[in-house]
Amino acid sequence: MQFCRFNVDRLGVVHGDEIFDVTDALDTLPDVKWVRSLHDPFVAALDQVAVKARALLASAPRLNRNDVVLEAPVALPSKIIGAPVNYHAHLDEAQDDHGLHQGAKVHPIDEIGCFLKAGSALVGDGATITLPKDAARVDHEAEVAVIIGKAGRDIAASDAMACVAGYSLALDMTARGKQDRSMRKSCDGFAVLGPTLATPDEVADPAHIAFSLTVNGEVRQASDTSLLIRSIPELIEMCSAFYSLLPGDVIMTGTPAGVGPVSTGDTIVVTSPELGVLTVNVA
């Protein structure tokens, strides 16, 4: 199923241009006693919610996708994890382009590991990103994101896919400069996720998810997860060796070659045959 959040925490199932409002399926969620749980309650209970959502589809109100405001499909990730330079072609361009490396040494993912983005950077499809005034430049980085469905620590790659709740498109927006990576990657709107959470049955082979990015209609990035240096199971193993992964945690798997700057007025579109279309505007 393709789940979306829309119009302030309503739950929808996406079929083409229609959204079926199945918000009542959230009645299956347990009561949260604290102000904020440590994980995303919707993702933690996704299997139960999906059963209720299927039962509601026949009678659910239908809305046109153009008439709703989509939010990031995950509301409360405890962590947004990024995988730097996880495509060989991007590693090559990052080492060669001063605009990307800004004079700093570029390390392969096996040397530098992963990084964290602030949860406050999270936005969904249709968002407007405001460029920070102190950035040397801001670049687009199209990615496939993995959404964790089951808690785990020290997860072996051979067991990793059983922990996956679904997949989404992502933009790991990045400001260039001398500041620490976490500062440059955590500006408001710099973690774009959407348009939906596609459950594993929607993806034929997560090792072969094709995706591309355009800016104002010009193709800048096009790749496939088969070209990842560290595969999705290997990334889950790597991350869980350092962090407990919780339901709703987002792992952005890395961006391919073609990273480039964006400017005020640009429209960025990330497209995947299986994961849909993710659009943001730059202000």
Predicted ranges, named:
Residues 1-104, 108, 201-204, 212, ...:
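N-terminal non-catalytic cap/leader segment that marks the start of a structured domain
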Residues 71, 77-233, 242:
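Glycine-enriched loop-and-adjacent helix/strand subsegments that border the catalytic/binding cleft
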Residues 281-283:
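Short beta-strand edge segments in extracellular beta-sheet folds
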